[in-house]
């Protein structure tokens, strides 16, 4: 589109005003196009579908280009989707991040009407459920209608800078007459720890008294040398109405008092930020991460368990470290406490997820607190998918709240939720206790599945999106602040809406119409990017810290010329620098795209080797269809471009200590890291590589575009333009050859960018500032939020709780039904061959044996035995299985086999013989079950 057309539109108040002019520019072709749009009847069309139809309708390429480069073409590029309900085509246009407009075009006469979000959603609903779209009593959710008193940002560029603007709003609110300072005074009077006043006491109950006492106190403190401990003059300050919390030394106390005095005299956001960073407001933090297996060892790769565990553990370490520094600077001897609250899972798969309390490594006062899911039948033992978790959350919140209060011996000062379930639990608890709350979505499921809102009925039996999207809306609107890693997460990019932005207006036909779900211009949104653990990911130049013990294995990993299960391909010229990439092997991560770019470019092949860490080599080892396709594509590319001797493919690596040293070894070769993803929400590997001093090329689609300053701290590449990207990488190596300092300059530029913006220390400082600042903002707006609070309570009780009743609560599978019969057939001298999980044996037989031989050691369950158990003793047949195995006839036969097996074992039978008897027992059980459940003929065939 021409720049003049874009400028013309930007001057207009709305797309609706310019749309008629755009259609008039080529009325004949426009009528043909819109007739084609409505030709197939009702449907939902995406931008690419509209473009395809235009290409079919306007055969003349010159005429088509003229239209697409004009005003209509620009409007089309702004359009995210179109609801087609003949004769109308309704467009949902997004000219800028966060800004949405809706227009309706009559395909017959090309008349244009501007419509509301509600009108657009009704047209969209009629594609999926026409009767519901016409229901005048259909439920509409409109948070905008009850949240109109809250200030809003106005520019797309302001999105995600909420705390900065909250400071400005507060300073504006406090400015003027002294009575406007009362909220700040009341906030200071409420500061306490375990009932002990901090900063000021009730003697300073007016602004005038506080201001006067501050002036006198500054004079008193000035008489002491700057390093004088607070305790030396604490009593003198107490007599003036001041309590501890101002600082640990005379210098610190004086600084804090002067800052407060200046805020009381003339509030400005800079001074307010400084004041709130010093106030003793946060000591005890609760972090919820409910689903999956949350632990410190042996959990990654288990269901619903991934990078979020590492994120939260690193977050906790950084928070505790920052809290300890602040508490010490405040002159307080308190010990901070951080609790990561998750689910206790009795069937823990060899992890510590069945352990209630676990100290977090690398911290002094932080723990994982696990609370079980409880139903009316008791504690739920097995893992539950994150999609099926909703019926348990209310009871979990109640039980967790009780445990937390008992553990902390007070209310927490800050509650942080993670993911939909953790955010909802955090919202329920924060509302009940009146505590400041923050939420972190990590990934909102709504944007992962196309049209998952409109097609929720199809997906609900499997994913329960009706529960999830409702829970997300509740948590987003309850929370005091929202933390995201990137701008893209909130408001996307020019072409793509953000994850939160997709909740602005959407519909779930037959359930509810959300005309205003969340406003991305709300100042509750904040960007606080995580860092990488700098004790693990540090520059390659720090020789004394490097993990040299990994060097032999890394040399083997990179240069051993023999293919094996861990690597294939080889590097003939070890003197060349290495182009390195590490990611999952899927389409979006685009690793095969990078290999193809490299294969096509002769210049780059001559200048550098290529090494990728991704997935498997053998398709049979993967259960993922997409990964299998990428594996095949990778092998094809290796053959097509004859990459042997230039390319090394390493299987996925999970040891982050060795991975960090691998980055540094690549830096030793003067290589680069390339992240070529088609889209990347954040880009943790980019942060890791830059931390290690490795010059980085990363996708311009998503978070990495924010991390890297192009040409200064790294380089942006376009994943959709391989030729341009590979040229950029090649030019870098050429410049490094001609300028010996260029590689070092980019390496140092990357490190500078990391230290300025992407460390866990910066993250912790931002988070604690938010906890203090939004805590005050929450108190100031308490009365205005009452209506919204009631609205949310109604949505939770009348909508969400009803939806959770449709989620099937699985039958608990206690050990007597699942394990007892099978395990009684096994000898007592069982060894653990699996993940190390221990299960309690609770059959009546075992209880009797335990009474006679008190303290008998519980038996570990082998992985193989667990698989047999899962295959044979399925939950829906467990009772019948039990009856079969306990029938007198079969029991006698099995007892004989068991005795024979035991005799063989006691006589020191060989492993082969032991294996033989194990197989016999298992096959006989299969035979019994087959005969009883599927008939004699089926059993004979078996």
From Swiss-Prot:
Residues 830-862 are annotated as: Disordered. Detected in the whole plant but more precisely confined to the vasculature in cotyledons, leaves, petals, anthers and roots. Disruption phenotype: No visible phenotype. Sucrose-cleaving enzyme that provides UDP-glucose and fructose for various metabolic pathways. Functions in callose synthesis at the site of phloem sieve elements. The gene is SUS6. GO terms for molecular function: sucrose synthase activity. It catalyses: an NDP-alpha-D-glucose + D-fructose = a ribonucleoside 5'-diphosphate + sucrose + H(+). Transmembrane segments: none annotated. Its EC number is 2.4.1.13. Optimum pH is 6.0-7.0 for degradative reaction. Optimum pH is 7.0 for synthetic reaction. Optimum pH is 9.0-9.5 for synthetic reaction. It is found in: Secreted, Cell wall. Belongs to the glycosyltransferase 1 family. Plant sucrose synthase subfamily. GO terms for cellular component: extracellular region. Keywords: Cell wall, Glycosyltransferase, Secreted, Transferase. It comes from the Eukaryota. InterPro entries: Glyco_trans_1, Sucrose_synth_GT-B1, Sucrose_synthase_pln/cyn, SUS_EPBD, SUS_N. This is Sucrose synthase 6. GO terms for biological process: callose deposition in phloem sieve plate; sucrose metabolic process. Residues 281-759 are annotated as: GT-B glycosyltransferase. Its main location: secreted. Residues 838-862 have a biased composition (Basic and acidic residues). NCBIfam families: sucr_synth.
């Amino acid at each position: 589109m021409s720049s003049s057309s874009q400028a013309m539109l930007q001057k207009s108040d709305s797309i609706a005003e310019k749309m008629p002019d755009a259609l008039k520019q080529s009325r004949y072709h426009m009528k043909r196009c819109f007739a084609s749009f409505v030709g197939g009847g009702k449907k939902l069309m995406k931008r690419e579908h509209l473009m395809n139809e235009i290409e079919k309708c306007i055969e003349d390429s010159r005429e088509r280009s003229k239209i697409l480069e004009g005003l209509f073409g620009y409007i089309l590029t702004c359009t995210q989707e179109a609801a087609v309900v003949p004769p109308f085509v309704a467009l949902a246009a997004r000219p800028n991040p966060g800004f949405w407009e809706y227009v309706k075009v009559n395909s017959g006469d090309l008349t244009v009407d501007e419509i509301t979000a509600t009108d657009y959603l009704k047209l969209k609903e009629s594609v999926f459920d026409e009767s519901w779209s016409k229901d005048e009593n259909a439920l509409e959710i409109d948070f905008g209608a009850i949240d109109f008193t809250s200030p809003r940002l106005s520019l797309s560029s302001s999105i995600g800078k909420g705390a900065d603007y909250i400071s400005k709003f507060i300073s504006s609110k406090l400015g003027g007459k002294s009575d406007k300072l009362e909220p700040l005074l009341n906030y200071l009077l409420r500061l306490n720890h375990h009932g002990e006043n901090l900063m000021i006491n009730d003697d300073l109950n007016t602004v005038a008294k506080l201001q006067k006492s501050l002036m006198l106190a500054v004079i008193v403190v000035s008489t002491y040398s700057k390093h004088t401990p607070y305790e030396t003059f604490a009593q003198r300050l107490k007599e003036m109405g001041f309590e501890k919390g101002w600082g640990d030394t005379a210098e610190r106390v004086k600084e804090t008092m002067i800052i407060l005095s200046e805020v009381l005299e003339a509030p400005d956001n800079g001074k307010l930020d400084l004041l709130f960073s010093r106030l003793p407001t946060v000591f005890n933090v609760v972090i919820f991460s409910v689903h999956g297996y949350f632990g410190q060892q042996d959990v990654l790769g288990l269901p619903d368990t991934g990078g979020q565990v590492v994120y939260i553990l690193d977050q906790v370490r950084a928070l505790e470290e920052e809290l300890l520094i602040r508490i010490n600077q405040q002159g307080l001897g308190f010990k901070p406490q951080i609790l990561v609250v998750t689910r206790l899972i009795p069937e823990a798969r060899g992890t510590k997820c069945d352990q209630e309390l676990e100290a977090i490594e690398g911290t002094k006062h932080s723990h994982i607190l696990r609370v079980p899911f409880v139903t009316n039948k008791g504690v739920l033992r097995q893992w539950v998918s994150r999609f099926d978790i909703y019926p348990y959350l209310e009871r979990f919140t109640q039980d967790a709240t009780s445990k937390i209060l008992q553990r902390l011996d007070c209310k927490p000062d800050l509650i942080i939720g993670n993911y939909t379930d953790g955010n909802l639990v955090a919202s329920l608890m924060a509302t009940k206790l009146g505590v400041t709350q923050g939420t972190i979505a990590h990934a909102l499921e709504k944007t992962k599945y196309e049209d998952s809102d409109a097609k929720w009925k199809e997906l609900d039996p499997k994913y329960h999106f009706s529960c999830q999207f409702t829970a997300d809306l509740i948590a987003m609107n309850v929370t005091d602040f929202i933390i995201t890693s990137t701008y893209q997460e909130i408001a996307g990019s020019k072409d793509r809406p953000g994850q939160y932005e997709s909740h602005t207006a959407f519909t779930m036909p037959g359930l509810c119409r959300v005309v205003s779900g969340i406003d991305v211009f709300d100042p509750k949104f904040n960007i606080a990017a995580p860092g990488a653990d700098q004790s693990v990911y540090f520059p390659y130049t720090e020789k004394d810290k490097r993990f040299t013990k990994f060097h032999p294995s890394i040399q083997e990993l990179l240069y051993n010329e023999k293919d094996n299960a861990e690597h294939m391909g080889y590097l003939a010229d070890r003197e060349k620098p290495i182009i390195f990439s590490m990611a999952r092997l899927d389409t979006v991560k685009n690793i095969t795209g990078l290999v193809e770019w490299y294969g096509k470019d002769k210049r780059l092949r001559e200048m550098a080797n290529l090494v990728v860490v991704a997935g498997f080599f053998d398709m049979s080892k993967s259960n993922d269809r997409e990964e299998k396709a990428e594996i095949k594509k990778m092998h094809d590319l290796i053959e097509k471009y004859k990459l042997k001797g230039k390319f090394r493919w390493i299987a996925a690596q999970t040891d982050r200590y060795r991975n960090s040293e691998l980055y540094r070894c690549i830096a030793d070769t003067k290589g680069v890291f390339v992240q070529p993803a088609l889209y990347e929400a954040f880009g943790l590997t980019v942060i890791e590589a830059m931390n290690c001093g490795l010059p980085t090329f990363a996708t311009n689609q998503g978070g990495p575009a924010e991390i890297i300053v192009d040409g200064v701290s790294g380089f942006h590449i376009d994943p959709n333009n391989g030729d341009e990207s590979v040229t950029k990488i090649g030019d870098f190596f050429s410049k490094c050859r001609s300028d010996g300092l260029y590689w070092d300059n980019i390496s140092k530029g990357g490190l500078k960018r990391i230290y300025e913006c992407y460390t866990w220390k910066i993250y912790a400082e931002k988070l604690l500032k938010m906890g203090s600042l939004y805590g005050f903002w929450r108190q100031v707006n308490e009365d205005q939020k009452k209506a919204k609070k009631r609205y949310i309570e109604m949505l939770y009780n009348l909508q969400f709780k009803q939806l959770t009743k449709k989620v099937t609560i699985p039958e608990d599978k206690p050990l007597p039904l699942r394990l007892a019969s099978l395990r009684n057939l096994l000898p007592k001298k069982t060894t653990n061959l699996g993940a190390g999980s221990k299960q309690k044996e609770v059959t009546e037989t075992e209880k009797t044996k335990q009474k006679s031989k008190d303290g008998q050691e519980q038996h570990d369950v082998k992985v193989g035995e667990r698989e047999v158990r899962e295959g044979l003793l399925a939950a829906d047949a467990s009772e019948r299985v039990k009856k079969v195995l306990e029938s007198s006839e079969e029991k006698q036969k099995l007892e004989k086999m068991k005795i024979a097996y035991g005799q063989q074992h006691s006589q020191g039978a060989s492993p082969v013989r032991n294996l033989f008897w194990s197989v016999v027992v298992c096959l006989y059980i299969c035979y019994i079950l087959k005969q009883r459940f599927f008939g004699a003929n089926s059993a004979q065939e078996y």
